[in-house]
UniProtKB/Swiss-Prot annotation:
This is Uncharacterized protein AF_0774. It comes from the Archaea.
C-alpha cells in the first residue's frame, strides 16, 4: 500500500511549483510524503491539524477539493478515497490551477 501511495505522489516530485505532496489518513496520520524543503514543515504541521476537520467536511458534503491560500502559496486538499486525502502545496496561483486538474483523476480505492 505504501509503495502505491509513493507512486501516486511521484509526479509531484518533478513539478517545480509543488512544494510538498502528502497523503494523509482522515485522522491526520501521514501515510506518504514528499517535501522539497524543510521550511515547509510548519505548514505541514498546520495541515495535519486541519486534515481531520477538512476530511469530515469534504466527505460529508461530497466536495471535490478544498483550497487554502497562504500569501502567494496555495494548498489543495483532495480526497483520494473514503479514508485518505492528498495535500499538495503549490508556490503560486497559476500552478494551483494546474495541480487541481492533475489531481482530478487520482483515486485510491479502499
Amino acid at each position: 500500500m505504501r509503495a502505491d501511495l509513493l507512486e501516486l505522489i511521484e509526479p509531484f516530485r518533478t513539478d517545480e511549483s509543488v512544494l510538498f505532496a502528502v497523503v494523509y489518513s482522515i485522522d491526520g496520520t501521514v501515510l506518504a510524503s514528499h517535501i522539497k524543503s524543510r521550511e515547509w514543515i510548519p505548514t505541514l504541521e498546520w495541515a495535519e491539524k486541519e486534515v481531520e476537520v477538512v476530511a469530515r467536511q469534504v466527505l460529508e458534503e461530497n466536495l471535490n477539493s478544498v483550497e487554502f491560500r497562504l500569501g502567494k502559496e496555495g494548498i489543495l486538499i483532495r480526497p483520494i478515497s473514503r479514508s485518505m486525502l492528498l495535500v499538495v502545496g503549490i508556490s503560486d496561483a497559476a500552478s494551483l490551477y494546474k495541480v487541481r486538474i492533475d489531481t482530478e483523476s487520482l483515486r485510491v480505492y479502499d
